Structure formats: C-alpha cells, structure tokens
Amino acid sequence: MNVWLNMLTTTGLGAIIGGYTNHLAIKMLFRPHRPIYIGKFRVPFTPGLIPKRRDELAVQLGKMVVDHLLTAEGIGKKLTDENFQREMIQWAQIEVDKLLMNERSLRDVLEKWELAHVEEKAVQEIEEMLMKKVDTFVSKYYTYTWEQALPQFVHEKVEEMIPKAATFILTRGTQFFESDEGKARLQKMIDDFFASRGTLLNIVGMFLGNVSVVDRVQPEVIKFLQQEGTKQLLRDVLQKEWQKFKGREVKELASFIEKEMIVKYIVSTTKTRDIVSGFLNQSVQKICEPVRTNIVETLVPNIVQKGLTWGVNNTAHILKRFRLAEVVQQEVSTFSTERLEELVLSITKNELKMITYLGALLGGTIGLMQGILLLFLM
C-alpha cells in the first residue's frame, strides 16, 4: 500500500512541478513589466523577457513581415491572379460608371473637388495656348511672306471664299439700300453732296420735276449692285488684295498688331468664354454619355490591367520606398507592455496552455518513473 502511495505521490508532485514550472516560464516571458530592485540590487529575470527585448522584438517583427509575409513575390503573385484582376476590373467599372452617370453639372463636381474658378482658369489656359501658338508662328515665319507661311489648305479655302464673300457683300449692300435706313443714308449723302455744290441742286431739280433725287438714285444703286459686272469687279478687287496680302511679310503685321490683340480677337470671335461656360454647365452624364460605354467596357479594363502590370513590375521598389519594416518597428515600439502581452496571448493562448499541460505530463511521467525505480530499489 505504501509503495502505491509513494508512486502516486511522486507522480502527482512531478505533474504539479512540471506544469507549474512551464506556467511560470510562460508568465516570465511577460512579467514583471518593469525591473524590480531590492536596494540597489536588481532581482534576476526582471523585467520579463519580452518587455526587456521589446525593441529587438519590434525590429525582428519588421524584418519578418518584409522577408516572409508581405514580400514582393507574394504581392506580385496576388496582382497577377486572374480572379483578383477580374474583381478589380469589376469594382473599377462600377465606381467609374457611378461618376459618369452623375447628374450634377461639371462645374458643381469640380467645385466639390475644390477646383474653384475653373471657368476663368480654362479661358486663361486657352489664351495662353493661343499666345504660344502665335509666338511660335511669328518666330518661325517672321521673315516669310504670308504665301510661304500659310498652309496650302488656307490658300485653297480663301480662294474658295472670295466669290462667296463678293456675293455676300453685294447681297447685304442691296438689302441695306432697299431698306428705309439705307434710303435715309443715301438721302443724307445726296444732300451733303449738293450742299457743297451751291445752285447745282436747283438745276437738277428742274430736270427731275416732282420726283426726288433719292427716288431716282436708289434704284440705280440697287441695279448697279445686282449687275454681274459689279460682282466680277468686286471679286477682282478682293483677289488683287489677297494677292497683295500674300506678298507681304509676316513681320509687317507683327510690327503694328500686338499678339494680345490677335488672341483676344480669336477668343472673342469664337465666343470661347460662352463655349466653356456652356460646357461646364452641362451635367457629367450628358457630357460623358457618348463615350460612357467605351470608357467603362474598354478604357477602364485596359487602365486597370496596365496599372496591375505596373504594380507587379514595381512592387519591390514600392516596398523599399515604403520602408515597411520601419513602419512595423515603429508601431510595435509604441505598444505598451500590457497590450503586447495581450496581443501575443490572444494569438498563442491555446498553444501556451498545451505547453503547460505538456509540462505537467512530462513531470508526472518523470514522477511515475521515479516511483517505479524506488519500487525496484526497495
């Protein structure tokens, strides 16, 4: 009976000692959090291992994350995964489509993105671009004649427009002199003419009787403007002036016309400000509707694909510039010892319990073997 009691006692003591020893060793990893002193003598094994080596732990965790967890190869493999690429493309298409279907005006959207005064900036950019174009043109063709400087299609267009311009001028002239305003202007011109000729008006009045001079002159002026010969005369005049202009040098125009005047004339003539304002007041949906399908179905997948490919090729460089190891090290260094202990225990709680149980099992086994050995010795 005493033999079995001895064996049970040694086994129990061994299990208790083994389990408690491992439990104490685990606790000593974290506790105490600070060194303990008796007088000037520091108690051995204080502070615990992890509090004592926290800075080294932070460095090693940073290296572990970079060398074994977030590696360039691992990230590159993820970026080239077909399922991941498909998900990214679908997500990008949904988000871009939301932007393109926005019913707010482009002006409101840009102002929301803190791009205020976008209209003024757009007009200013256009003016600056035109100024650069004018500068480039004048610098390049300063000693050229306009015939040499202007492209061939401009020559052809002007030649084509001369007959149309002559017809337009004569048509407008005819319409003007047929109107009451034109008749009144013609009357004034006649009155001014005869006023400087003294009695000439009385002599003409004798020949015309009760018919006023303007009533006789107006039909003749209109008839003159409508004659084919007049049209040909005006075409010839315009053609001669065009030929003279082509023979002049570009520098002649640049010497008496400021470039700013040219730019402002172009902006004013083309109503650039009104065009920009009208464009900005349109909804994003209306502006993007003609190209929405092409953007969502073609452009977005291509951009995402190229972006992922670029990411694969530059992952190592990005991680190096990001200095991920330093980020992890700095974050871990800011953890309190209590939080660090809680973090480690939350991850390894079950494993540490098993280590405690294993210590108890080994201690109990050793105690049992001691009991058996004592039995044989007795």
Curated annotation (Swiss-Prot):
Transmembrane segments: 358-378
Coiled-coil region: none
Keyword S-adenosyl-L-methionine: no
Pfam family, one: DUF445
GO CC annotation: plasma membrane
Annotated compartments: Cell membrane
Highest taxon above the source species: Bacteria
Record-linked InterPro entries: DUF445, UCP032178
Protein's UniProt keywords contain Transmembrane helix: yes
Keywords: Cell membrane, Membrane, Transmembrane, Transmembrane helix
Membrane topology of the entry: Single-pass membrane protein
Alphabetized PANTHER family for the sequence: UPF0754 MEMBRANE PROTEIN YHEB (PTHR35791:SF1)
Family as reported in the entry's similarity comment: Belongs to the UPF0754 family.
Protein name in the entry: UPF0754 membrane protein Bcer98_0694
UniProt organism field: Bacillus cytotoxicus (strain DSM 22905 / CIP 110041 / 391-98 / NVH 391-98)
Lineage: Bacteria, Bacillati, Bacillota, Bacilli, Bacillales
